[in-house]
UniProtKB/Swiss-Prot annotation:
Pfam families reported in the protein's UniProt record: DnaJ (PF00226)
Origin superkingdom: Viruses
InterPro entries: DjlA_DnaK_co-chaperone (IPR050817), DnaJ_domain (IPR001623), DnaJ_domain_CS (IPR018253), J_dom_sf (IPR036869)
Database matches in PROSITE patterns: DNAJ_1 (PS00636), DNAJ_2 (PS50076)
Keywords, sorted A to Z: Chaperone
Presence of the UniProt keyword Chaperone in the record: yes
Species per Swiss-Prot/TrEMBL record: Acanthamoeba polyphaga mimivirus
Every J domain range: 13-83
Protein name: Putative J domain-containing protein R445
Amino acid sequence: MSVEYKQKNDVPDLYKILGLTNDVCKESDCDERIRKAYARKAKKYHPDKYPGKKDIVEIFELITMAYDVLKDEKQRNEYNQRLIVEKQACSDYLKLKKRYNDFADSIGELKEPSNEQKLSFKEQMKAINSKHGYDTSQETAIPANQAKKKLSSLAKERASQDVNLRPEKLFDDGRFDLGTFNAVFDKYHKKSDSSIMPHNGVPSAWNEPTNSMNFSSFDNLDNIYVDDNSRLDISRQMFGDIDFGSSLPKISKQDISDIGRADYVDGHKVLGDDYYKDLKSKISEREKDSDLFDKMKYGDYKKDTAGYGVLDQLGCDFSEIYLDKCLPGSLEEQVEKLMAERKKVIPPTEFQYLSAPVSSRTNGSVGR
């Protein structure tokens, strides 16, 4: 049974806690609006108005925490950067998830092409036929007797190929020899690289005095036709050397016997004299590192990514995670408890975002 997961926000929306949006930062009196919003919320949910209600105390602490971060311009700018990164990451994830769901739903469905697609296909076929000088009016159906003769001829040709092109068993009794195989492979594949490469010039018709490689152009399937029939599209052609695509010579049992075995095959599993000594040394180093990590505490871990972190590329400085200082460690458990009591005092429309998992509100780390 599939489970539908809801979006999880690792960064709490402090503006929403105060009944605002991040658009308030664009206003000239941003600080004053944040202060007034905090005053309204603090007055409405002050613990003195609800004596004995622990859930109200927790909500008041949450409102105060949001104001402590947003009232300072530096902390507010850092928080805005974090919020932008979080929303962008969530947006990318949801887009990918939607694309996957659409693809999964479309599997097995046969959609008829639209009229525009049919028209576009016909126009493209007409253009290709025109370039090749192909006249579709001359098309005629192949008679049934000729089709049967052609099919019979192809079947006979395929049967003869199965006999003539059957590979010889190079290893006696089917026993594969890795050393012999590697020696033959190295010999027949040890040559100059003949991979395809882009070429922006015209190949020379003359042999070079040096040992340079000659090239011959061939069609690039990504650029079959040129719109201008008066020129050759040299700038976008692909070239390969003249040996490109040539088949390797056929190997016989006698060739294998003459080549022998590769020397490096038999010795690759031989352990050196210092093998076990080096192994013990590495195990000892690993144990020391493990002990060191086990003794490390929260503040001992390095936060410096040497400029290679994701947030470093965004120009954000998160060397000091201010939310860690603002969120008490017990807030997660306390907020979970107050959810059951919330509807008794607070209208259902208030703080609906609090129904999301609160583990994201107590996590002040930048990355995981």
